[in-house]
């Protein structure tokens, strides 16, 4: 089947004093060995830092594909070897070991590897910045470490303050949006973003899965951006990041352009305007 990964599937819990990292017995701690680095491409902005061994660092990376709170997160470390694809690990965002924390339960462990061959855990929709940030104001100021736990193991990335790195990330995102022909400041003032007319989970169907990839058990994770015009029609599909065979990219854009329909974005006074819709889809077999 196709599992559509959407940000509203994962519940957000407010920062609460539940120090599970401090109570854990089997903990691997990864200290930073490089500064944070922001990288700008023509499709996304990334924020990454090396941890562990300086000669061969593990990686904590965030990637953003549009304005707002959605982030893709990636962890690479052979300390994650205890994870299996069938697991449902928990991501823990915390303020030191004994301070407040909140958890994000993943529906599955999306595992892979980067060119360095280390175990890689993909988190398509990190809840570092929740959709309703009322109970977690300025999360990038508060959170100092990010961990993953399952099977009695905990791996902790001692990230430090994220305030300045994410300031740079937001500046990068503004510059990227300008290359799409849009004004980031005007987008912030929208009274409404494009609203899907039908559930996005229905835009891609089980019978869209490519036959060969299904037979081989191949899976994919695709981040896309649709430009949506004043009439609510998708006019362009851009693959912003893909951990997949190209066939998944092709099918994703073809089907979305054919099936996705929107109520258009509205400016401050309610006039329809062009904007974009950015999301991610996981192609998985079960």
Mark where each language-model region is:
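Bacterial N-terminal signal peptides that target proteins for export
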Residues: 1-9
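Bacterial N-terminal signal peptides
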Residues: 9-17
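An ectodomain-focused feature that recognizes extracytoplasmic/extracellular
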Residues: 23-85
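Residue-level signal for well-ordered, solvent-exposed loop/turn and beta-edge residues enriched
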Residues: 37, 231-233, 238, 271
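Extended low-complexity, serine/threonine- and proline-enriched intrinsically disordered segments
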Residues: 74-110
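Internal interaction segment
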Residues: 101-203
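Short proline/glycine- and basic residue-enriched helix-capping loop/turn segments at helix->loop/beta transitions
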Residues: 188-227, 250-286
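A short acidic/small-residue loop/turn micro-motif
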Residues: 211, 241-247
